[in-house]
Regions:
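C-terminal structural segment of proteins
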Residues: 1-261
Length: 261
Protein backbone atom coordinates (compact mmCIF):
# COMPACT_ATOMS: atom_id res chain seq x y z
CA UNK A 1 0.00 0.00 0.00
CA UNK A 2 1.08 3.61 -0.49
CA UNK A 3 0.09 7.08 0.62
CA UNK A 4 -2.28 8.51 -1.98
CA UNK A 5 -2.99 12.23 -2.17
CA UNK A 6 -3.73 14.96 -4.68
CA UNK A 7 -1.36 17.47 -3.07
CA UNK A 8 1.61 17.55 -0.71
CA UNK A 9 2.29 20.52 1.57
CA UNK A 10 5.27 21.13 3.86
CA UNK A 11 4.52 24.08 6.18
CA UNK A 12 7.15 25.98 8.13
CA UNK A 13 4.89 26.60 11.12
CA UNK A 14 1.94 25.12 13.00
CA UNK A 15 -0.14 28.12 12.00
CA UNK A 16 0.38 27.29 8.32
CA UNK A 17 -0.28 23.61 8.95
CA UNK A 18 -3.50 24.21 10.87
CA UNK A 19 -4.79 26.65 8.26
CA UNK A 20 -4.23 24.08 5.51
CA UNK A 21 -5.77 21.30 7.62
CA UNK A 22 -9.01 23.27 8.05
CA UNK A 23 -9.39 23.93 4.32
CA UNK A 24 -10.72 20.46 3.53
CA UNK A 25 -11.89 17.55 5.72
CA UNK A 26 -9.86 15.22 3.50
CA UNK A 27 -6.61 17.07 4.27
CA UNK A 28 -4.46 15.04 6.66
CA UNK A 29 -1.42 15.51 8.86
CA UNK A 30 1.44 13.13 8.15
CA UNK A 31 4.10 12.51 10.79
CA UNK A 32 6.21 9.42 10.14
CA UNK A 33 3.47 8.22 7.79
CA UNK A 34 4.07 4.52 8.44
CA UNK A 35 0.63 3.60 9.74
CA UNK A 36 -1.11 5.92 7.26
CA UNK A 37 0.64 4.08 4.45
CA UNK A 38 -0.68 0.75 5.71
CA UNK A 39 -4.25 2.08 5.75
CA UNK A 40 -4.15 2.91 2.04
CA UNK A 41 -6.67 5.76 2.24
CA UNK A 42 -7.07 8.52 -0.34
CA UNK A 43 -6.25 12.04 0.93
CA UNK A 44 -6.75 15.42 -0.69
CA UNK A 45 -3.63 17.05 0.78
CA UNK A 46 -0.93 15.52 2.96
CA UNK A 47 0.54 18.04 5.39
CA UNK A 48 4.11 17.13 6.31
CA UNK A 49 5.19 18.55 9.70
CA UNK A 50 8.89 17.72 9.30
CA UNK A 51 9.84 21.41 8.93
CA UNK A 52 7.46 22.82 11.57
CA UNK A 53 10.07 22.72 14.39
CA UNK A 54 8.41 19.92 16.34
CA UNK A 55 11.43 17.64 16.69
CA UNK A 56 12.95 18.27 20.14
CA UNK A 57 13.40 16.90 23.63
CA UNK A 58 13.85 19.50 26.37
CA UNK A 59 13.61 19.52 30.12
CA UNK A 60 13.12 21.94 32.96
CA UNK A 61 13.04 21.36 36.70
CA UNK A 62 9.64 19.63 36.72
CA UNK A 63 8.88 18.39 33.20
CA UNK A 64 10.24 16.79 30.05
CA UNK A 65 8.92 18.39 26.84
CA UNK A 66 8.87 16.20 23.73
CA UNK A 67 7.98 17.61 20.32
CA UNK A 68 5.40 15.57 18.44
CA UNK A 69 7.75 14.95 15.49
CA UNK A 70 10.47 13.42 17.67
CA UNK A 71 11.14 9.91 16.40
CA UNK A 72 10.75 6.88 18.64
CA UNK A 73 14.46 6.18 18.24
CA UNK A 74 15.33 9.70 19.40
CA UNK A 75 13.08 9.28 22.43
CA UNK A 76 14.64 5.89 23.17
CA UNK A 77 18.24 7.17 23.02
CA UNK A 78 18.00 10.75 24.34
CA UNK A 79 19.97 11.32 27.57
CA UNK A 80 16.86 13.08 28.92
CA UNK A 81 14.15 10.52 28.19
CA UNK A 82 16.25 7.35 28.30
CA UNK A 83 16.68 7.63 32.09
CA UNK A 84 13.02 8.20 33.02
CA UNK A 85 11.90 5.60 35.58
CA UNK A 86 15.20 3.80 35.37
CA UNK A 87 15.06 3.52 31.59
CA UNK A 88 11.89 1.41 31.55
CA UNK A 89 9.90 3.94 29.48
CA UNK A 90 12.60 3.98 26.82
CA UNK A 91 12.75 0.17 26.95
CA UNK A 92 9.01 -0.05 26.30
CA UNK A 93 9.36 2.18 23.26
CA UNK A 94 12.41 0.23 22.08
CA UNK A 95 10.11 -2.79 21.77
CA UNK A 96 8.33 -1.20 18.78
CA UNK A 97 9.27 -3.30 15.70
CA UNK A 98 12.94 -2.58 14.78
CA UNK A 99 15.40 0.37 14.77
CA UNK A 100 14.78 1.22 11.10
CA UNK A 101 11.07 1.58 11.84
CA UNK A 102 11.70 3.63 15.01
CA UNK A 103 13.95 6.00 13.06
CA UNK A 104 10.86 7.06 11.07
CA UNK A 105 7.88 6.59 13.39
CA UNK A 106 7.19 9.62 15.60
CA UNK A 107 6.03 9.90 19.19
CA UNK A 108 3.18 12.21 18.16
CA UNK A 109 1.92 9.98 15.38
CA UNK A 110 2.07 6.94 17.63
CA UNK A 111 -0.09 8.68 20.24
CA UNK A 112 -2.48 10.55 17.95
CA UNK A 113 -3.53 7.37 16.13
CA UNK A 114 -4.71 5.70 19.37
CA UNK A 115 -3.61 2.39 17.87
CA UNK A 116 -4.77 -0.70 19.79
CA UNK A 117 -1.38 -2.39 19.35
CA UNK A 118 0.67 0.58 20.58
CA UNK A 119 3.61 -0.08 22.90
CA UNK A 120 4.14 3.68 23.10
CA UNK A 121 0.72 4.43 24.60
CA UNK A 122 0.96 1.58 27.09
CA UNK A 123 4.43 2.77 28.16
CA UNK A 124 3.30 6.35 28.78
CA UNK A 125 -0.24 5.90 30.10
CA UNK A 126 0.65 5.22 33.78
CA UNK A 127 2.72 8.43 33.91
CA UNK A 128 1.56 12.00 34.43
CA UNK A 129 1.46 12.92 30.72
CA UNK A 130 -0.17 15.98 29.17
CA UNK A 131 -0.82 16.45 25.45
CA UNK A 132 -0.72 19.93 23.92
CA UNK A 133 -2.78 20.45 20.77
CA UNK A 134 -2.39 23.49 18.54
CA UNK A 135 -4.06 25.95 18.65
CA UNK A 136 -5.56 25.81 22.15
CA UNK A 137 -6.36 22.42 23.65
CA UNK A 138 -4.70 20.44 26.44
CA UNK A 139 -5.63 17.10 27.98
CA UNK A 140 -4.05 14.17 29.74
CA UNK A 141 -3.14 11.07 27.75
CA UNK A 142 -5.95 9.14 29.44
CA UNK A 143 -8.46 11.89 28.59
CA UNK A 144 -7.35 11.77 24.97
CA UNK A 145 -7.75 7.99 24.76
CA UNK A 146 -11.29 8.34 26.12
CA UNK A 147 -12.13 11.34 23.92
CA UNK A 148 -14.98 10.63 21.54
CA UNK A 149 -14.32 11.68 17.98
CA UNK A 150 -11.40 13.63 16.57
CA UNK A 151 -9.63 16.45 18.39
CA UNK A 152 -9.82 19.77 16.54
CA UNK A 153 -6.13 20.53 16.44
CA UNK A 154 -2.61 19.30 15.77
CA UNK A 155 -0.67 17.42 18.44
CA UNK A 156 2.22 19.72 19.20
CA UNK A 157 3.94 18.49 22.35
CA UNK A 158 3.95 15.72 24.92
CA UNK A 159 4.77 16.84 28.47
CA UNK A 160 5.94 14.22 30.97
CA UNK A 161 6.15 15.11 34.64
CA UNK A 162 9.41 14.15 36.31
CA UNK A 163 8.72 11.90 39.27
CA UNK A 164 10.61 9.42 41.38
CA UNK A 165 9.38 5.89 40.99
CA UNK A 166 9.81 2.41 39.58
CA UNK A 167 8.34 0.84 36.47
CA UNK A 168 7.86 -2.56 34.84
CA UNK A 169 7.11 -3.14 31.15
CA UNK A 170 6.26 -6.41 29.42
CA UNK A 171 5.33 -7.05 25.80
CA UNK A 172 4.13 -10.55 24.92
CA UNK A 173 4.87 -11.28 21.26
CA UNK A 174 5.37 -14.21 18.91
CA UNK A 175 8.67 -13.03 17.38
CA UNK A 176 11.08 -10.17 18.11
CA UNK A 177 9.61 -7.79 15.52
CA UNK A 178 5.93 -8.63 15.99
CA UNK A 179 3.10 -6.46 17.21
CA UNK A 180 2.15 -7.27 20.80
CA UNK A 181 -0.32 -10.00 21.62
CA UNK A 182 -0.80 -8.00 24.83
CA UNK A 183 1.39 -5.51 26.71
CA UNK A 184 1.67 -4.17 30.25
CA UNK A 185 3.11 -1.21 32.12
CA UNK A 186 3.08 -1.07 35.91
CA UNK A 187 4.37 2.04 37.67
CA UNK A 188 4.76 3.10 41.27
CA UNK A 189 5.15 6.86 41.60
CA UNK A 190 4.54 9.09 44.60
CA UNK A 191 3.69 5.92 46.56
CA UNK A 192 0.75 5.15 44.27
CA UNK A 193 0.35 2.29 41.82
CA UNK A 194 -0.69 2.61 38.17
CA UNK A 195 -1.46 -0.34 35.88
CA UNK A 196 -1.91 -0.10 32.09
CA UNK A 197 -2.85 -3.01 29.83
CA UNK A 198 -2.89 -2.65 26.05
CA UNK A 199 -3.43 -4.72 22.90
CA UNK A 200 -6.37 -6.67 24.37
CA UNK A 201 -6.78 -6.10 21.29
CA UNK A 202 -7.91 -2.55 22.13
CA UNK A 203 -6.02 0.63 22.99
CA UNK A 204 -4.35 0.65 26.38
CA UNK A 205 -6.40 1.55 29.42
CA UNK A 206 -5.72 1.92 33.13
CA UNK A 207 -7.03 -0.81 35.42
CA UNK A 208 -8.57 1.60 37.92
CA UNK A 209 -10.19 -0.96 40.22
CA UNK A 210 -6.99 -2.99 40.45
CA UNK A 211 -5.06 0.21 41.15
CA UNK A 212 -7.51 1.11 43.92
CA UNK A 213 -7.03 -2.28 45.57
CA UNK A 214 -3.24 -1.89 45.51
CA UNK A 215 -3.34 1.67 46.78
CA UNK A 216 -5.70 0.79 49.64
CA UNK A 217 -4.61 -2.69 50.70
CA UNK A 218 -1.39 -3.57 48.88
CA UNK A 219 -2.84 -6.99 48.06
CA UNK A 220 -1.02 -7.96 44.88
CA UNK A 221 -2.93 -11.18 44.18
CA UNK A 222 -6.30 -9.49 44.57
CA UNK A 223 -5.26 -6.56 42.37
CA UNK A 224 -3.98 -8.88 39.62
CA UNK A 225 -7.22 -10.87 39.71
CA UNK A 226 -9.30 -7.69 39.55
CA UNK A 227 -7.44 -6.50 36.45
CA UNK A 228 -8.67 -9.58 34.58
CA UNK A 229 -12.25 -8.87 35.67
CA UNK A 230 -12.55 -5.14 35.04
CA UNK A 231 -10.89 -4.97 31.63
CA UNK A 232 -12.40 -6.18 28.38
CA UNK A 233 -10.54 -8.85 26.40
CA UNK A 234 -11.32 -10.30 22.97
CA UNK A 235 -10.14 -13.16 20.79
CA UNK A 236 -7.91 -12.52 17.79
CA UNK A 237 -6.54 -14.89 15.17
CA UNK A 238 -3.33 -15.67 17.10
CA UNK A 239 -4.41 -15.50 20.75
CA UNK A 240 -7.60 -16.23 22.67
CA UNK A 241 -9.45 -13.98 25.07
CA UNK A 242 -8.83 -16.49 27.88
CA UNK A 243 -5.08 -16.57 27.27
CA UNK A 244 -4.94 -12.78 27.33
CA UNK A 245 -6.70 -12.86 30.70
CA UNK A 246 -4.26 -15.47 32.03
CA UNK A 247 -1.29 -13.39 30.88
CA UNK A 248 -2.78 -10.30 32.49
CA UNK A 249 -3.02 -11.95 35.88
CA UNK A 250 0.56 -13.21 35.64
CA UNK A 251 2.24 -10.03 34.42
CA UNK A 252 0.25 -7.56 36.49
CA UNK A 253 1.28 -9.59 39.53
CA UNK A 254 4.92 -9.67 38.42
CA UNK A 255 4.87 -5.97 37.69
CA UNK A 256 3.41 -5.09 41.07
CA UNK A 257 5.95 -7.31 42.80
CA UNK A 258 8.79 -5.67 40.87
CA UNK A 259 7.82 -2.06 41.57
CA UNK A 260 7.07 -2.84 45.22
CA UNK A 261 10.63 -3.96 45.97
Amino acid sequence: MSLRANYYFKPKSLEEAYSKLKEDPKNSIVAGGLWMKRMGLQHNCLIDLSEANLNYIKEDKEFVHVGAMTTLREFETSPITSILFGGVIAFGISEVVGPAFRNIATIGGSIFGRYPFSDVITSLLPLDVKLIFYPKQEMSLEEYLNFKGKVDGILQEIIIKKENGKAFFKKVKTTALDFPLINFMVVKRNDKYFIAVGSRPMAATLAHKAMEIMNKTGNIEEAAEEATKELQFLDSFNISKEYRMDLTKVYVRRGLEEVSK
